[in-house]
From Swiss-Prot:
Subcellular location field: Cytoplasm
One GO cellular component, as annotated: cytoplasm
UniProt GO molecular function: D-tyrosyl-tRNA(Tyr) deacylase activity; Gly-tRNA(Ala) deacylase activity; Ser(Gly)-tRNA(Ala) hydrolase activity; tRNA binding
GO biological process entries: D-amino acid catabolic process; tRNA metabolic process
SUPFAM superfamilies, sorted: DTD-like
Reaction(s) this enzyme catalyzes, per UniProt: glycyl-tRNA(Ala) + H2O = tRNA(Ala) + glycine + H(+); a D-aminoacyl-tRNA + H2O = a tRNA + a D-alpha-amino acid + H(+)
Cross-referenced InterPro entries: Daa-tRNA_deacyls_DTD (IPR003732), DTD-like_sf (IPR023509)
Protein name per the record: D-aminoacyl-tRNA deacylase
E.C. number(s) listed in UniProt: 3.1.1.96
HAMAP family xrefs: Deacylase_Dtd
Family: Belongs to the DTD family.
Length: 145
């Protein structure tokens, strides 16, 4: 399971001209689900994402996680993160989980975030989405479990 996380001052996702998720300061999480992923990996990745200390403390040091910083989380499914890009000029998506399994794990990940008392907004699984964000820093990390 892969999460591309970006520290943002604001972010939103729109599906068919409807804003489905919108946050102020916090994390935009682009989430990719791979074939071998399961609930245990989703739990570990959620723990890492929410615990990752990439927000500044009073001394300006990256020392706070999203909850300590009072931030929110916007989770957007992105199957392209599971692409194999090592060869050729076209990505292969054979490493990605089947859509029904990927959706179940995506929803599980979102629910785990919400259980941690974090304001968690979402896109719409498998939809054509427009994601708008202001990357703060920029600060972007690739987390994989």
């Amino acid at each position: 399971m892969i999460a591309l996380i970006q520290r943002v001052t604001r972010a939103s996702v729109t599906v068919e001209d409807e804003v489905t998720g919108k946050i102020g300061p916090g994390l935009l999480v682009l989430l990719g689900v791979e074939k071998e992923d399961d609930e245990q990996k989703a739990n570990r990745l959620c723990e890492r994402v929410l615990g990752y200390r990439i927000f500044s403390d009073a001394d300006g040091k990256m020392n706070l996680n999203v909850q300590q910083a009072g931030g929110s989380v916007l989770v957007v499914s992105q199957f392209t993160l599971a692409a194999d890009t090592e060869r050729g000029m076209r990505p292969s998506f054979s490493g990605g989980a089947a859509p029904d399994r990927a959706q179940a794990l995506y929803e599980y990940f979102v629910e785990r975030c919400r259980q941690q008392a974090i304001n968690t907004q979402t896109g719409r699984f498998a939809a054509d989405m427009q994601v708008e964000l202001v990357n703060d820093g920029p600060v972007t990390f690739w987390l994989q479990v």
